[in-house]
Amino acid sequence: MLKGHKVNLAIVEKTDLPVLKDWGNDVDFVGEFEPFSQVALSDLEKQYDARGDTQWFLVQKKNGTSIGYMGHFKSKDCMAIGYMLVGKERGKGYGSEAVQIMVDYLFLHKDIVRIQAETHPDNKASQRILEKAGFSKEGIIRRSFFSRGAYRDTAMYSILRDEWKQPRILPLGHAARKKAP
């Protein structure tokens, strides 16, 4: 478990998949900025079994209540992250801390020089989360995906290892820092 001040990140176990399915099938949880389609538990189980380097985490309040999820996956020679929280828990700093924990974790444990994240250009809350964690906006990827009847743009954000410098939440002793290539 990755421990923060407000939230912890717990590895998703197969027994957690029904919760992810329920969230993924809830249009209010997915929100207005993400693609929405119904997900079957059997499909989630197949993704879970074939995840490879991808890791999924539950975002949990300190009392153990799961309030969202996030994950990381390899994208070319870097890591990409994604995250979602239940609506009533947004705007309380939980997402910001979860992203910062993930950034610390990835730079402490993975031999990478870059972490990236995509968000909708109108999703100002998600952009603030990324900027608080040290990400910089790189630009807009025009018409990058089809969702809800239209092609949508994506805002690309990234943080480089030399911009990160040191962990903000996880302790330095959490892991030996690997040198980037």
Q: Predicted segment positions?
A:
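Acyl-donor (CoA/ACP) binding surface of acyl/acetyltransferases
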Residues: 1-27, 59-181
